[in-house]
Amino acid sequence: MVPWEGYVSDETMGTFAPIALYWVYAGGYQLVLHRRPLERYRLHTRAEEEEKNLVALPAVVRGVLLQQLVQAIVAMILFMVTSDSSAVVVQPPIIIQAFQFLVAMLVMDSWQYFVHRYMHQNKFLYRHIHSQHHRLIVPYAIGALYNHPLEGLLLDTVGGAISFLVSGMTPRTSVFFFCFAVLKTVDDHCGLWLPYNIFQSLFQNNTAYHDVHHQLQGSKYNYSQPFFSIWDRILGTHMPYNLVRRKEGGFEARPLRD
């Protein structure tokens, strides 16, 4: 039994809940990002954000909305093709759902690592497609899904669809998986190193790890996203870092390689 049962279908929730959650979670971060009490947790100063970022917030919002429109269309098609409206979907035991969840995480990580890395290595793709995401040199939460539309389709939307299909999860399980993936992705771009943050505590691949990738020195490292750093470690693209306190307040993710 889930709260939406009897009101909307699992397929509808799987399509729109992650989008709504994105704006709630990222919007919450955006509201507090420039509050003075949180200055001591920032990975970059306000001045750095204003000076280094090459795109304004309204353009970022428009870009994210466009990606989410495409994402919703693909999700509706995917559920329409894979769901049997005449059959009663029986949820597997929790242990099976947990296994499917883990499989989906590993599949999504694998897909995104290799596509992401190739977009950096292919000069044409980087210049014309992936560089749009790196206009945010100082990442912030709302910009987590700020991508070129083609990258958004290939990296995030197709990656999510493949994770769903390979794992064999039901539409209901996918609601929780895609919402979790959205929360993790937003948190990885939040630009704040917060105490008691569960994502930053449990995952080595977190906002500081991804911040290194957005720096010039780390742009060819730390491709892994959104969950683990497995592929970076296996294939030699892992860049370690020290998290140091800045004298003027806040933190800095300082790469350890020259």
From Swiss-Prot:
Keywords associated with the record: Endoplasmic reticulum, Lyase, Membrane, NADP, Transmembrane, Transmembrane helix
Keyword Transcription regulation: no
UniProt note on tissues of expression: Expressed ubiquitously.
Primary location group: endoplasmic reticulum
TM helices/strands, residue ranges: 13-33, 63-83, 88-108, 149-169, 175-195
Keyword Transmembrane helix set for record: yes
Pfam family, one: FA_hydroxylase
Gene Ontology cellular-component terms listed: endoplasmic reticulum membrane
Subcellular location: Endoplasmic reticulum membrane
Membrane topology: Multi-pass membrane protein
Domain Fatty acid hydroxylase: 101-237
BP-aspect Gene Ontology terms: lipid biosynthetic process
Reaction equations catalysed: a long-chain fatty aldehyde + 2 NADPH + O2 + H(+) = a long-chain alkane + formate + 2 NADP(+) + H2O
EC number(s) from the headed UniProt entry: 4.1.99.5
GO MF: aldehyde oxygenase (deformylating) activity; iron ion binding; oxidoreductase activity
Family classification: Belongs to the sterol desaturase family.
Annotated function: Aldehyde decarbonylase involved in the conversion of aldehydes to alkanes. Core component of a very-long-chain alkane synthesis complex.
Subunit structure: Homodimer.
Stated name of the protein: Very-long-chain aldehyde decarbonylase GL1-9
Gene name in the database record: GL1-9
